[in-house]
């Protein structure tokens, strides 16, 4: 049995927005509200990033066309006692999918948590932050 950090990608559609900043704010609020309603406040919500195919620069994955926005988001959670990476993926999708019905979820990254054998402290870091 292993413990994993699972990062899921989710496309969130928002309506009645004018700018990409508005779309991001509404999407974060919408996702956070849905997760909190299901008592999933342990899921970390972050804005996704895309890469420009021409210059290679990274930018926030938020696009607005005709007052409708599409925001790419990363949802990060820990999965404990999974039998395999595939099992951790299924658990993460089931847990988050319960709150975000009709939102397609795709695995962006899965990493196994490392534990300090002495006291069980997790040594894995995610984007420079302790998880």
From Swiss-Prot:
The organism's place on the tree of life at top rank: Archaea
A Pfam family recorded for this sequence: DUF555
Family statement drawn from the similarity comment of this UniProt entry: Belongs to the UPF0212 family.
Entries under NCBIfam families matching the protein: PRK03922.1 (NF003035)
PANTHER family, per the entry: UPF0212 PROTEIN MJ0068, UPF0212 PROTEIN TK1194
HAMAP family cross-referenced by the UniProt entry: UPF0212
Protein name: UPF0212 protein TK1194
């Amino acid at each position: 049995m292993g413990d994993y950090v699972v990062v899921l990608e989710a496309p969130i559609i928002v309506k009645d927005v004018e700018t990409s900043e508005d779309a991001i704010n509404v999407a974060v609020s919408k996702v956070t509200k849905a997760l909190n309603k299901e008592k999933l406040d342990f899921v970390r919500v972050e804005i996704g990033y895309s890469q420009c195919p021409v210059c290679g620069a990274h930018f926030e994955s938020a696009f607005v066309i005709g007052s409708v926005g599409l925001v790419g988001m990363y949802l990060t959670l820990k999965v404990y006692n999974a039998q395999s990476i595939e099992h951790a993926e299924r658990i993460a999708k089931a847990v988050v999918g319960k709150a975000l019905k009709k939102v397609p979820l795709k695995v962006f990254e899965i990493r196994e948590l490392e534990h300090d054998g002495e006291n069980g402290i997790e040594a894995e870091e995610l984007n420079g932050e302790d998880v």
